[in-house]
Amino acid sequence: MGQSSSISSSNEEGSSHSKKFTNSKDILAYFNNKAQQQVTIPELVSFKGNLQIEDLNTPISHKALCNSLYFPQNHAMIVGIVTNMLRVLSNFPLMKSSYEPITGYGLLKCILLLNRARCAKFLKTKSYDQLKLLFISLSLQKTDKEELSEESENDGNKELTIKQIITGFDDVDTEMLCIPADFMLQFLTWLLILTVDCPTTNSKLDNTETHDQWGNFKVSALNLLRTMNPDVVGDIESHSITFQQFSTAIRTVMPNLLKPLENLMEHFFYLQHDLVDHDTNLSSIQDSKVMTPALLAQLSTGLPKELFIHKLQSLYIGRKSGFSMRSLQAKVFKWMAPSILVVSGMRITNSEEYAAEKNPRYRHFLEEFPKLKESDQMMDASHLNKRKTTFAVYIDDPWKVTNKDYFGDLNTRIIEISPRQDIYKVNQKGTIYFNTIGGGIGIGDKQPLIKPASKRYIPGNVSLTFDSTLEFAVFRNTGYGGSLDPGLLSMERKEENSPYELHFLIQDVEVWGCGGEKELEEQIKQLEWEEAESKRRQQINLRSLGEDRALLEMAGLVGQHQGGGSM
């Protein structure tokens, strides 16, 4: 349909993979031209229009970059982190050895490299380690040019193929790199805000309100930071994040973390009048103490991406309706679609002292719950030093009273939210009970043994247990053998057999409806229609000799023997 940027691009592509390069200039030129070939003519027109440039070799001003990325006011650190990241990526594939400023070509490469699908197409490989590239871009500092060693200068004469250049990461050794924890905290906070502000590639951005909540999002970002490095519990400035920590956490328990960054970068391909208003559904959670925009953003990093576009429905809020099984049952049991149970409280650090001196009800609970011995527990620093504890349970089935049996399908999962993030998936159906004869609520437990004069909880190896008064809860993790597997993060780190137990005093319990399949399908169709409409409005009739033709010539896309991007 559209004009090709190269008459014989397919032939050149085949021969270029065997082509060898000996100097940086040719390498950069090759990847710059290839980047332009990856985008459509309408995308290129919008890209140039947003940046107000005609030539892709034009350096992008700091002001234009900041305006396009909608950085928060008075947050110089995140501006520095992201602009440095983009400068590193703009010099791809010579991230370490090239110090060119960010040009139109460079920014095009940034957009492609930060988009998972576009990156695979751009580099012609699905196995490329995009997380390693991102980590390098966040680690390297492009302030002062390093003095090249004699060995590096001699390497300039080496012949390298495209594959060698791509997979070599410019000889950057990620084992020698790390990101300061305070830098990573700022970056994670910004990504969580983008989750709310930029849910799609074509949504209008008006982030003043969410930027005012930077502190709230920072709390959730701290949970993600401790997921990467559980030792970050005190002085953040004294800690750092390694590539192994960064990669492991994102791959296992926050696979959607970078999607909002993809969405933001795609905005360069839409002019302002092509953007659409998007309802982020935050009005329904404005009265919640727990289900805040920040917590919802954190949840969306690990749960299926469809969750965030669900119309969340407040079903039960303990602070309003009362902390009782009866109130929860009355509010929740008519809901016939998926739901999320959220519980938050303060960890009881000295059980015996608390039971003896402060809360006789807890002493009674300990008589019914078989507590792990302190000497048998192996908690990491985040669990030992942080008392705030929050869990969510995703439940696909409708709730029901189960005094003898269980409910819950294979999509049920427990998500640890604070002090770090981990995800515990079920390995069988029927893992939840709602016991109205004194047994409370259990996920991953066996039904309690209830007799006229006694009661005994039977916690599973991985389980979350609520007492019948919704005053106390216990999360147990002792490894394999139960109806839930150990956490994805724990298994990846080979820590699944490190037993621990979190007893906490419940402060909040809430249940939120996620919407049924029909509503979800309608919302997805609406989003797809909106994006298609934006693309349709974006299309320019290349045969027109009117204003559209003039715009293309001004942008240097047609006329004067110019080609363009692909269609």
From Swiss-Prot:
Transmembrane segments: none
UniProt xrefs under Pfam families: TLD
Cellular component, GO annotation: cytoplasm; fungal-type vacuole membrane; nucleus
Keywords of the record: Cytoplasm
TLDc domain boundaries: 289-515
Subcellular location per the Swiss-Prot or TrEMBL entry: Cytoplasm
GO BP of this protein: protein-containing complex disassembly; response to oxidative stress
InterPro entries attached to this UniProt entry: TLDc_dom (IPR006571)
Family affiliation: Belongs to the RTC5 family.
Additional information: Present with 2600 molecules/cell in log phase SD medium.
Task performed by this protein: May be involved in a process influencing telomere capping.
Protein name as annotated: Restriction of telomere capping protein 5
Organism (species): Saccharomyces cerevisiae (strain ATCC 204508 / S288c)
